[in-house]
C-alpha cells in the first residue's frame, strides 16, 4: 500500500497538472459533431485551445461563454443561455458539452439552473443534447476531468433500461481513459474486431483526433468520433470493458443504467496486462486468440530478454496522471526496474493500492528533488518535464499530455504487445545513449609514455 504525500507548498513550481476542464473537453471531442463550451472567460478557452492545437496539431473546436468583470460578479447565466443559443443556431451540433472553469465555479454558477433557463426560452432546440459537467480548475487534474465528463456523457446520453442486455450479442462497450492515445484506441478496436466483436469506444478519439485530412475544407464541429445514436445502443451490448482505473465512477454509472456486466483493466502495458485483455476477449467472443497475437507475444518476450540488461535495477522517475503512472510502474516493475520518484498532479483512489512505497501529489519541482535524491537515471513525463530532466542530466521519455515538442507523439500506440515492446526498446536506448560510466583510475605512480608527460612551463 502506497503512502500518499499531499502537497505542502503554497505555490506550484513548474506545474505538472493540466486542468479538469481540458480533460472534460477532450472527452467531448471524442463524440461526433460535438462542441465543448467553456463557461468562463475568453482566456480560459484560448489557453486550452493552444494546448490542444500544439499537442494534436489539428484544428480543435472550442467555444466560450465569455464571462467578463460584470458577469463574474452579477451572475453569468445569461452568458450560458446566449452561448448555447448561438451554437445551436449557427453550428447545429449533435451534442454540446457545457463545462465549468475555475472562474465560473468560484463565482458560484449553477449549470443545471442555466440549462433549465435555456430549455425554457428556446424550446426549438429541445432535441439538442447538452452534457453539463462541473470541472473546477482548482481541484482534480486532466484525467479526473475526463473521467467526470465520461460519467456525465453516460448519465445524459445512455437510456436507463436494463432489459436490453445482449440484444446486440457481438457489440462490446469500451470506456477509454484520458491517457489512451488515438493509436492506443485503434489497437483496442482492432483487437476487439479480431475476435469477431464490434467495439463501441466511449469516447472515440481515434476517429476525431487521429490526425487525418478531412474531405471538407472547414468544419466548425468535430469530424469523426462516436455518434449520439451509437452511444444510445450501449445498453444492448454483451459486455463493457473499462480501460483505466480512473473510470470506475463512469463504469458504475453505465452498469447501473444498463445492467451490462463489465470487466476492468489498468493500462494495457506489459505481458500480464495484455494477456488478461486478450483472454477476456476470448471468453466474451468464444473464439480462440488469433495466431498473430501469439507471435507478437513471443516478440515482446524477446524484447524483454534483450532489454533486461539495461532496465533491470534501473532507477526511474515518473511524473504523470495516476492511470499513466500506474501503467508505467507496472511495466518497469516487470523488468526489475525501480520507480524512485512518483509524482501525480492530484490524488486518486487507485494510488493507495499500488505497490509503490510512496506517491507525492505535487509538481515537477517535487519530481526533480525526489529524482535527485533517488539518483534517477531516467524521467518519464510530458514535454513540460524536459527542463527538469536536463537539470538532472538524465534522458526524458515523453508520455502523457501535452507533447508539444515531439511530432506524432499524440498518436503513438503504447498498448498491446507491440506497443510494450517499443516502450522497452525506447527506454533501453535512452539509458544506453546517456550511459554515465565511471572514470578509470590512474595511479599517480604509473609510468606514462613521453607524449603524455605534463608540459612544464618555465
Curated annotation (Swiss-Prot):
GO terms for molecular function: metal ion binding; nitrogenase activity. Pathway: Cofactor biosynthesis; Fe-Mo cofactor biosynthesis. SUPFAM superfamilies: Helical backbone' metal receptor. PROSITE patterns: NITROGENASE_1_1 (PS00699). Coiled coil: none annotated. Belongs to the NifD/NifK/NifE/NifN family. This protein may play a role in the biosynthesis of the prosthetic group of nitrogenase (FeMo cofactor). This is Nitrogenase iron-molybdenum cofactor biosynthesis protein NifN.
Amino acid at each position: 500500500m502506497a503512502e500518499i504525500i499531499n502537497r505542502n507548498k503554497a505555490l506550484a513550481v513548474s506545474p505538472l497538472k493540466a486542468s479538469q476542464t481540458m480533460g472534460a473537453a477532450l472527452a467531448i471531442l471524442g463524440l461526433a459533431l460535438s462542441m465543448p463550451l467553456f463557461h468562463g472567460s475568453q482566456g480560459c478557452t484560448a489557453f486550452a485551445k493552444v494546448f490542444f492545437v500544439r499537442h494534436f496539431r489539428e484544428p480543435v473546436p472550442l467555444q466560450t461563454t465569455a464571462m467578463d468583470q460584470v458577469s463574474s460578479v452579477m451572475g453569468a447565466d445569461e452568458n450560458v443561455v446566449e452561448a448555447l443559443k448561438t451554437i445551436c443556431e449557427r453550428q447545429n451540433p449533435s451534442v454540446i458539452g457545457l463545462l465549468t472553469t475555475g472562474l465560473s465555479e468560484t463565482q458560484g454558477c449553477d449549470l443545471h439552473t442555466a440549462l433549465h433557463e435555456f430549455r425554457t426560452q428556446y424550446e426549438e432546440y429541445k432535441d439538442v443534447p447538452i452534457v453539463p459537467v462541473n470541472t473546477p480548475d482548482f481541484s482534480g487534474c486532466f484525467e479526473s476531468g475526463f473521467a467526470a465528463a465520461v460519467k456525465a456523457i453516460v448519465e445524459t446520453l445512455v437510456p436507463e433500461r436494463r432489459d436490453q442486455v445482449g440484444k446486440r450479442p457481438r457489440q462490446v462497450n469500451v470506456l477509454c481513459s484520458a491517457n489512451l492515445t488515438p493509436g492506443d484506441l485503434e489497437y483496442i478496436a482492432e483487437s476487439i474486431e479480431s475476435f469477431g466483436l464490434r467495439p463501441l469506444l466511449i469516447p472515440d478519439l481515434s476517429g476525431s483526433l487521429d490526425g487525418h485530412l478531412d474531405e471538407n475544407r472547414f468544419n466548425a464541429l468535430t469530424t469523426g468520433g462516436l455518434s449520439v445514436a451509437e452511444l444510445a445502443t450501449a445498453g444492448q451490448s454483451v459486455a463493457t470493458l473499462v480501460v483505466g482505473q480512473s473510470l470506475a465512477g463512469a463504469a458504475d454509472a453505465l452498469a447501473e443504467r444498463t445492467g451490462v456486466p463489465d470487466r476492468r483493466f489498468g493500462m494495457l502495458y506489459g505481458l500480464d496486462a495484455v494477456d488478461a485483455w486478450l483472454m477476456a476477449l476470448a471468453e466474451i467472443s468464444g473464439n480462440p486468440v488469433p495466431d498473430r497475437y501469439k507471435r507478437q507475444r513471443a516478440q515482446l518476450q524477446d524484447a524483454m530478454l534483450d532489454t533486461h540488461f539495461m532496465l533491470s535495477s534501473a532507477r526511474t522517475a515518473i511524473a504523470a496522471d495516476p492511470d499513466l503512472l500506474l501503467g508505467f510502474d507496472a511495466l518497469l516493475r516487470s523488468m526489475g526496474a525501480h520507480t524512485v520518484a512518483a509524482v501525480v498532479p492530484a490524488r486518486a483512489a487507485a494510488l493507495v493500492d499500488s505497490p509503490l512505497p510512496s506517491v507525492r501529489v505535487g509538481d515537477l519541482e517535487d519530481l526533480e528533488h525526489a529524482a535527485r535524491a533517488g539518483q534517477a537515471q531516467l524521467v518519464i513525463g510530458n514535454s513540460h518535464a524536459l527542463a527538469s530532466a536536463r537539470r538532472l542530466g538524465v534522458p526524458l521519455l515523453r508520455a502523457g499530455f501535452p507533447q508539444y515538442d515531439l511530432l506524432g507523439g499524440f498518436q503513438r500506440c503504447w498498448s498491446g504487445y507491440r506497443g510494450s515492446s517499443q516502450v522497452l526498446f525506447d527506454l533501453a536506448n535512452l539509458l544506453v545513449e546517456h550511459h554515465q560510466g565511471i572514470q578509470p583510475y590512474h595511479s599517480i605512480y604509473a609510468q606514462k609514455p613521453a607524449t603524455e608527460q605534463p608540459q612544464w612551463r618555465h
